Amino acid sequence: MSVVQPAGRRLTVRDIASRKSPAAEPVVCLTAYTAPMARLLDPHVDLLLVGDSLGMVIYGLPTTHGVTVEMMIAHGQAVVRGSSHALVVVDMPFGSYQESPAQAFRNAARILSETGAAAVKLEGGREMAETVAFLVQRGVPVMGHVGLKPQMVHAMGGFRAQGRDEAEAEAVVAETRAIAEAGAFSIVVEGTFEQVAARATREVSVPTIGIGASADCDGQVLVIDDALGLFTDFTPKFVKRYADLASTVSAAAEAYAADVRARRFPAPEHCFGIRKVG
């Protein structure tokens, strides 16, 4: 059972960055895309990630490539409004930062100023280190994302775990180190062989947040729709389902439809009637 966090100030980038030592409590992260969901998750987590995964789980897109800055801003605003405790981080979508550090800064600054979120997340290894440093030097906190990078799914040959051989393992460790040295305050390590993710965690001085990686990471994140059993198109190997809300929602809709068709709903207690006087 989750431990409800005490009410008080919202967690900061510095709070998350400090959770690195083996004695530190692991960082608890979940994705959120709406104010009601953020409100439910906020007391239990340290970080709410407004992930570009919303393109697939909310909008039904086949990949995250169709997600826009405007979509991320709208959902980022909702999550910030719905939370008061967790640090809120917003993904930078595909095409919004890869062209140049200047492009990345323009879009990151817009995301932060229009949402009220504390940080942005971007994918990439050594090729993005210059961009990460450029943003951090200009006051934009950055969470990195290495290993399996969904925005590069086509270039990477699909959704396949990284670190299968020595060359891939070294590449994952090197990109984790490069992003940490560039100034990221934490790094998501996704879809990476356990031993490789554990090694990458040991070799950097900032917290790693695992998703399909290792229990040795400094924190964990899951897509909330996966964890709640709401997204049923497919279930990644690394997902643990904590509920089966798809079945619950379907059963509720079925019961509602039956009541309407049988004229059991609305019942008198659900209707506004005229009071009798005298």
UniProtKB/Swiss-Prot annotation:
The keyword DNA-binding does not apply. It is found in: Cytoplasm. SUPFAM superfamilies: Phosphoenolpyruvate/pyruvate domain. Mg(2+) binds at D52, D91, E123. Its EC number is 2.1.2.11. GO terms for cellular component: cytoplasm. Its main location: cytoplasm. It is an enzyme of class 2 (transferase). The keyword Cytoplasm applies. One of its GO terms (molecular function) is magnesium ion binding. Keywords: Cytoplasm, Magnesium, Metal-binding, Pantothenate biosynthesis, Transferase. Signal peptide: none annotated. It catalyses: 3-methyl-2-oxobutanoate + (6R)-5,10-methylene-5,6,7,8-tetrahydrofolate + H2O = 2-dehydropantoate + (6S)-5,6,7,8-tetrahydrofolate. Its cofactor is Mg(2+). 3-methyl-2-oxobutanoate binds at D52, S53, D91, K121. Homodecamer; pentamer of dimers. Belongs to the PanB family. PANTHER family: 3-METHYL-2-OXOBUTANOATE HYDROXYMETHYLTRANSFERASE. Catalyzes the reversible reaction in which hydroxymethyl group from 5,10-methylenetetrahydrofolate is transferred onto alpha-ketoisovalerate to form ketopantoate. This is 3-methyl-2-oxobutanoate hydroxymethyltransferase. It comes from Rhodospirillum rubrum (strain ATCC 11170 / ATH 1.1.1 / DSM 467 / LMG 4362 / NCIMB 8255 / S1).
